[in-house]
């Protein structure tokens, strides 16, 4: 927000405060002033000149020889190259000795043999940004109104002795996106009064309602719409003071009618729009939602395709403007416009924001509607605009307005105690001082025994709770005045929760196993949201109300899809060996209207080589057992390995023969496996394995305690066993049966071979186990080991129908 220091003085008396002092004070009150710009940029010696004579240069067709009165004893001759120079004009003249931006000094010169005693200036040459110069003067010199005094300071007329404060407003302070809002802020800081604009509106006997009717179909999106007629306007330039104020605010002057709507926007923060009444095509205004695919050509000469949630202003059939964003070219005010219909409305910020984003079209008006405007200024703004059009465009303001008013402006009362204010701020401000601050803020209030009941004006939508009032007191008191104190109270030593400790263990182990941590988006697209879920969920994923894109429109139900995107991205860039893991949240949908259930999961993906450096030995490709080994090591670290089993599973998107559920105490908590070949093809990856499991359920299980034992002094005995079983037999279940049957002497069971070759019967396979027997107190005898081993053989024969392989 650019704030003209001189313009601001019209609303609050700050003549005793310099612009820099004001900037410092505003910054200390909580609104950052990013800079103060002096508009004249060091320019000196530029005056108003009157062109007495103008003729072609005898030696150059594109130059003119001018005799110009600059308010001195004798007129001066100046050679000018501007195409729009002419006799009788009043123009800015840089005299000999004048200084222009960049410390450029004007000297006497000869141009093609003719003397030149000065320079006729364009606005750009006086330091004004070319983007802010009206089209009329974009390629030529500036021309003053005919009543400009010859010899007067041109910079004063152009308001270039002004200073502009640039405010860096946060989204909650939309009330300062206009001059009156800033005036209220400055008045509160200095304890002064705000002088509101005087509206001198003379209306004709004719009524606006005789020319136009207004109806609103989309009442929720447009609760208030006001229209007013101004007839017989004469389009021309706006007054100089208005043009200079608009340029200081960063707005290019266009014409008197358009400039007035922009001026009101900057003064009140109320966006207005002016229609050429004679181009409307009907005598009615209908505000409705657009039809899907409806077309409109906007003021920037672009054809826009509308969607059904966009709000439009129509003549009953055809769209005339995109509400709150931009007007239509068909009803644009031009030099031929005679009758003007002014619009002042309150459009829902959410609707305007979505429309603006969809169309890729952002304007000063849309920015203010998005952040929220003061609905109580809507009528005052349109009346002031009509008065200015009557005065500066020669128009006739018709009596009254036509409105569709469904707006319910509810009074907000927020209460706070003086005790709370002082407790939160660490101050000792009296209740009377606080009352003075609320008075300076123009917040009506009542006080009962130290409790303030504050009626918050509509211009301050950011004040909703007592803490907001505490902030207002703190801002006006001055944060730099709050006394410095040491921390008080009991110091509590921080520590990690059990879940935090376990998460650190997970990260430490997986990184030690060669996986890199990834952090992916919690948002995903509709087609990926339900992929690779640990538990099937029939409810629809949670949708964002206003997603930035379709790719990030739903909350994820699995971590795997985003990790696969990361793998695909790496593989496409020739990084073929990737091992990633993520600890993150998924969002399980609940009943309609309730918040989703957030649950912490662990997921990982591995592809390419597991070992690929020479010092690690032979290269090893990632397979099911490599990934399973990583998980088994993790479960050992977490103390739940004896409670974990694996069960073959068929899951969508996973390889049907290389996928298993991870089961904890009989409950499926995750899965592990290889991607389905079709999924690998879509991602353009090969040999890719994934896993995902619920950390909530793992952490919620009591971990086995870790015991330490002395290094054994007695030897152990090893027996191997190869048995033939059906292909459906699970090695993990057999290993568990062997461990139970072997008793206390059997300390370790390892599967070291799986054979399914030509020599095996159809439907059979061979499993080979190595069993280690040991007693820490003595040396075992062969008979003791044989007895335990026979129990193992008997158990697997009875349980699985196993036969010793011969």
Curated annotation (Swiss-Prot):
Record localization: Cytoplasm
Keywords: Aminoacyl-tRNA synthetase, ATP-binding, Cytoplasm, Ligase, Magnesium, Metal-binding, Nucleotide-binding, Protein biosynthesis, RNA-binding, tRNA-binding
SUPFAM superfamilies on file: Anticodon-binding domain of PheRS, Class II aaRS and biotin synthetases, Nucleic acid-binding proteins, PheT/TilS domain, Putative DNA-binding domain
Co-factor binding comment: Binds 2 magnesium ions per tetramer.
Main location as per UniProt: cytoplasm
GO CC entries: phenylalanine-tRNA ligase complex
tRNA-binding domain boundaries: 40-155
Keyword Ribonucleoprotein applies: no
A biological process from GO: phenylalanyl-tRNA aminoacylation
Domain FDX-ACB: 712-805
NCBIfam families per UniProt: pheT_bact, YtpR
Protein name in UniProt: Phenylalanine--tRNA ligase beta subunit
Name of the gene encoding the protein in the UniProt record: pheT
């Amino acid at each position: 927000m650019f704030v003209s220091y001189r313009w601001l003085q019209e609303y609050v008396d700050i003549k005793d405060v310099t612009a820099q002092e004001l900037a410092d004070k505003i910054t200390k009150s909580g609104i950052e002033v990013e800079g103060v710009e002096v508009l004249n940029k060091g320019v000196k010696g530029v005056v108003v000149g009157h062109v007495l004579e103008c003729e072609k240069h005898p030696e150059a067709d594109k130059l003119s020889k001018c005799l110009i009165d600059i308010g001195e004893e004798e007129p001066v001759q100046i050679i000018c190259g501007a195409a729009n120079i002419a006799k009788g004009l009043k123009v800015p003249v840089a005299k000999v000795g004048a200084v222009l931006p960049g410390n450029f000094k004007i000297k006497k010169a000869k141009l093609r043999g003719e003397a030149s005693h000065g320079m006729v200036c364009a606005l750009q040459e006086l330091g004004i940004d070319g983007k802010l110069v009206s089209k009329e003067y974009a390629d030529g010199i500036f021309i003053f109104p005919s009543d400009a005094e010859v010899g007067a300071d041109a910079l004063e007329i152009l308001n270039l002795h002004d200073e502009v404060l640039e405010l860096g407003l946060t989204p909650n302070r939309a009330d300062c996106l206009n001059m009156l809002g800033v005036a209220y802020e400055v008045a509160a800081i200095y304890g002064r009064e705000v002088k509101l604009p005087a509206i001198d509106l003379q209306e004709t006997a004719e009524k606006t309602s005789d020319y136009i009717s207004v109806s609103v179909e989309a009442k929720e999106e447009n609760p208030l719409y006001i229209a007013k007629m101004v007839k017989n306007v004469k389009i021309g330039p706006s007054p100089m003071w208005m043009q200079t104020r608009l340029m200081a605010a960063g707005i290019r002057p266009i014409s008197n009618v358009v400039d007035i709507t922009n001026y009101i926007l900057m003064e009140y923060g109320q966006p207005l729009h002016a229609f050429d009444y004679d181009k409307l095509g009907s005598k009615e205004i209908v505000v409705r939602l657009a039809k899907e695919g409806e077309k409109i050509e906007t003021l920037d000469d672009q054809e826009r395709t509308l969607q059904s949630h966009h709000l439009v202003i129509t003549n009953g059939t055809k769209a005339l403007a995109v509400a709150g964003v931009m007007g239509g070219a068909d009803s644009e005010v031009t030099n031929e416009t005679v009758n003007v219909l002014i619009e002042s409305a309150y459009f829902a910020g959410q609707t305007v924001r979505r429309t603006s984003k969809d169309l890729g079209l952002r304007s000063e008006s849309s920015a203010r509607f998005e952040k929220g405007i003061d609905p109580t200024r809507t009528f005052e703004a349109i009346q002031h605009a009509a008065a200015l059009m009557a005065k500066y465009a020669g128009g006739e303001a018709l009596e009254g307005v036509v409105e569709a008013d469904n707006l319910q402006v509810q009074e907000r009362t927020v209460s706070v105690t003086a005790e709370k204010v002082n407790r939160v701020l660490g101050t000792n401000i009296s209740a009377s001082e606080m009352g003075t601050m609320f008075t300076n803020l123009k917040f009506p209030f009542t006080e009962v025994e130290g409790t303030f009941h504050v009626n918050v004006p509509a211009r301050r939508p950011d004040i909703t709770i007592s803490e907001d009032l505490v902030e207002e007191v703190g801002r006006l008191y001055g944060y730099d005045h709050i006394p410095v104190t040491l921390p008080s109270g009991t110091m509590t030593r921080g520590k990690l929760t059990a879940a935090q400790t376990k998460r650190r263990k997970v990260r430490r182990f997986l990184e030690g196993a060669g996986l890199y941590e990834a952090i992916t988006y919690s948002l995903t697209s509709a087609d990926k949201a339900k992929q690779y879920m640990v538990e099937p969920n029939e409810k629809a994923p949670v949708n964002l109300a206003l997603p930035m894109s379709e790719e990030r429109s739903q909350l994820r139900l699995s971590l795997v899809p985003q990790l696969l995107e990361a793998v695909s991205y790496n593989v496409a860039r020739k990084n073929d060996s990737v091992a990633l893991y993520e600890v993150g949240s998924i969002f399980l949908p609940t009943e309609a209207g309730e918040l989703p259930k957030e649950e912490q999961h662990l997921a990982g993906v591995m592809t390419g080589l597991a070992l690929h450096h020479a010092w690690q030995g032979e290269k090893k490709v990632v397979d099911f057992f490599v990934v399973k080994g990583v998980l088994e090591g993790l479960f050992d670290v977490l103390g739940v390995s004896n409670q974990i089993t694996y069960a073959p599973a068929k899951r969508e998107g996973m390889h049907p023969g290389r996928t298993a559920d991870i089961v904890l105490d009989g409950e499926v908590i995750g899965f592990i496996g290889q991607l389905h070949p079709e999924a690998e093809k879509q991602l353009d990856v090969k040999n890719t394995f994934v896993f995902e499991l619920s950390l909530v359920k793992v952490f919620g299980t009591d971990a086995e305690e870790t015991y330490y034992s002395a290094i054994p002094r007695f030897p152990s005995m090893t027996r191997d066993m190869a048995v033939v079983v059906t292909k459906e037999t699970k090695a993990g279940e057999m290993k568990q049966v062997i461990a139970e049957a072997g008793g206390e002497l059997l300390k370790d069971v390892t599967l070291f071979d799986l054979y399914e070759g030509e020599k095996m019967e159809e439907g059979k396979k061979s499993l080979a186990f190595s069993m280690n027997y040991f007693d820490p107190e003595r040396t075992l005898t062969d008979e003791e080991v044989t007895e335990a081993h026979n129990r193992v053989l008997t158990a697997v024969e009875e349980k699985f129908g196993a036969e010793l392989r011969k």
